[in-house]
Amino acid sequence: MRWDRFVLSCPTATFFHRAGWQQIMAKVFRHDTHFLYSETDGQIDGVLPLAHVKSMLFGNALVSLPFAVYGGVAATDEAAAMALEAEAQRIAQRLGVDHLELRHVAARHDDWPKQDLYVTFRKAILPEEEANMLAIPRKQRAMVRKGIKNGLRSDIDPGVD
């Protein structure tokens, strides 16, 4: 699928930009979706997955992407990113939502409102197990070691089936 090929090649895209989330949002959560894309010369150069959330708990919002830590615009071209944001704003106005929420990995606009509800930690996984343990802050490392002592383990699964 063209969308996912673009997502896999775009440095600003995340797992949550993948096309499969559209079905999850629509079929599982029953949210109307607006998966926008931009293209130049027949090639996708930006995507923006959106879902319209209307609920007593979460209010009336257009979100990229609900129940995901990331979303927002993923683009290889600034003009494409701006066009996708503008279209999202038009859709938000047409739907009459209370707010439009774009969950970018890094803020795109300093003058847009933001919430600092979540924090992300990223660290490269080193080949040596102990080096990875030492990269974890002391208190958290003690909690990890306690989990391991109590039988916590991790496995690498070659597939999702």
Residue locations for each model-derived region?
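N-acyltransferase acceptor-side catalytic subdomain
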Residues: 1-161
